[in-house]
């Protein structure tokens, strides 16, 4: 899956969550600016950050990465 498609899924999961970007950033140990970059620029979270993000958002990393369509 291309990075642009991964960003779409990541943006979708973050937007549908009950958390603000600032809350997500604080919970996973990055800046709110970094969350914004994940959503809008060609920047992808490090594996450990992706893991924390998926746990917080209750979504499978396989879904974000496009390996499955199961949320």
Give the residues covered by each predicted segment:
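DNA major-groove recognition helix of helix-turn-helix
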Residues: 39, 57, 65-68
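Short alpha-helical "recognition helix" segments of helix-turn-helix
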Residues: 24-25, 53
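A short, Lys/Arg-rich alpha-helix, primarily the initiator
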Residues: 1-19
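DNA major-groove recognition helix of helix-turn-helix/homeodomain DNA-binding modules
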Residues: 48-63
